[in-house]
């Protein structure tokens, strides 16, 4: 069994909804903006190589993965559980449109952790995305894995080229990244927030 896996997780490129600060979640099938696609393509060579490619099923992640990893894309492994948070009745709306909505204000006042009407709570998101991440680890190990921890977490930005070959690249969402890393590496949920096209590199140590 391989004891250490190197993984990079990348947030998809920017969408129109991101620009308008909307809650773009699990239900949305937005594509990248033309400008975002051009930026990702321009920086393609600065993203590290990987042996396997995993993605969320969301179209914006598929778009991004195809631009960064064109040679791996046809063999990509789609993991449904790595999709973004289900924002329920908040989906597609922004703060300005909901600032006087009692249900939205209650959710925000609770630290954005509670159950969203028609959607998920943060705990539900964390549970789902951790299940998806475990699928990634087990696919890499080719067997059931009963324990692992995440170490050596470093932020990745595509402005600096890296030469490391990773065991896996995951193209997913801001919520997915914050959920998985805050649960496995510790720290505040929002401390793992990244801009579109950025992400984190880390090591998975298998026990």
Report residues per predicted region.
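Short glycine-rich phosphate-binding loop at a beta-alpha junction
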Residues: 50-57, 148, 167-171
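Short, basic, low-complexity termini and linkers enriched in Ser/Thr/Gly/Pro
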Residues: 37, 142-150, 158-165
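Domain-level recognition of soluble alpha/beta enzyme cores
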Residues: 187-207
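GST superfamily/GST-like fold recognition
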Residues: 174-178
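Phosphate-handling substructures
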Residues: 68-130
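Beta-strand elements within well-structured catalytic alpha/beta cores of enzymes
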Residues: 6-10, 166-172
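Active-site-proximal alpha-helix that buttresses catalytic centers in soluble enzyme cores
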Residues: 5-7, 11-72
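Active-site signature of alpha/beta-hydrolase-fold catalytic machinery across serine-
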Residues: 67, 179-183
